[in-house]
């Protein structure tokens, strides 16, 4: 496929991105839901599996996008989901593109801090 949508639970995206890439056409794209409750270590997940700390959100987004870059995906866009998870988790959508030749990191950077801040400013009301 040239496009894949990923929404997984109880497993890290870092465990599925490489197998998915191996099934894709070159220069394919992925839209993936980053769920902090399944990316953060158990010590960082609160009651009912909710991650409320913006610093943990930033940490897991950076971890997932760094891993994606390590397997030749460029994180081209990041946005928070306007819908919280069932227990109140804030989740994030990332658009990944199989890194084409000639694309620089500047062109693929996403502003994690701004997106996490906007998510909490909007949804923590």
Regions found by a protein language model. Name each.
Residues 35, 88:
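Residue-level signal for inorganic ion chemistry
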Residues 14-31:
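A short glycine-rich, Lys/Arg-flanked "PGG" loop and its adjoining helix->strand segment in the class I
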